[in-house]
């Protein structure tokens, strides 16, 4: 689990970023050599390799979010739940996170986010909750082409552009991500 407030997820016992990433691995009884290797792998994935010897509290908000993600993925979980994991990241950090997320294949990831454009690029399935009820579920293109006004969810930027330009996919839907945009059929008046 990656919490919306990443500082609340950290152990508070670690002297360094490396120690924080290693914390759960040590508690699981992993061999020391394997721990060091895994810490370096995860730190590289999260862009924290240069911060491994720093104190966790010296990191920026975005770096702390990446550290929280690193601690969550260190043990290779089968399922990962993340609550707004990019809320404190700068645009570059967000882009790097979603690029990393697009590479994740062996882990089922549930992510709560308002980063609609990024979500449309990486999500296989989107669920929409409204007033505590699931009101939609499906592939991003299916869900975002059938948004209800009272859900107060903005359409992805690509979809908004496509609507203004009257660009459609072969099935009549508007594109919602880069891959869809490449399949656009132009409608001429």
Which role fits each region the language model picked out?
Residues 107-112, 115-121:
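Conserved H-loop
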């Amino acid at each position: 689990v990656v919490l919306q407030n990443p500082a609340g997820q950290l152990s508070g016992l670690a002297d360094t970023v490396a120690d924080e990433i290693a914390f759960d691995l040590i508690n699981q009884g992993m061999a020391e050599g394997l721990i060091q290797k895994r810490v370096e792998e995860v730190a590289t994935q999260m862009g924290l390799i240069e911060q491994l010897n720093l104190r966790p509290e010296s990191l920026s908000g975005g770096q702390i979010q990446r550290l929280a993600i690193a601690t969550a993925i260190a043990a290779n979980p089968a399922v990962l739940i993340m609550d707004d994991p990019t809320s404190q990241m700068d645009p570059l950090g967000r882009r790097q996170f979603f690029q990393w997320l697009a590479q994740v294949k062996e882990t089922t990831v549930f992510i709560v986010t308002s980063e609609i454009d990024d979500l449309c690029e990486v999500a296989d399935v989107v669920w929409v909750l409204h007033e505590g009820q699931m009101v939609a579920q499906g592939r991003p293109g299916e869900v975002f082409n059938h948004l209800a006004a009272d859900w107060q969810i903005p359409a992805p930027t690509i979809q908004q552009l496509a609507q203004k330009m009257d660009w459609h996919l072969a099935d009549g839907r508007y594109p919602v991500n880069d891959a869809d945009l490449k399949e656009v059929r132009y409608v001429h008046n």
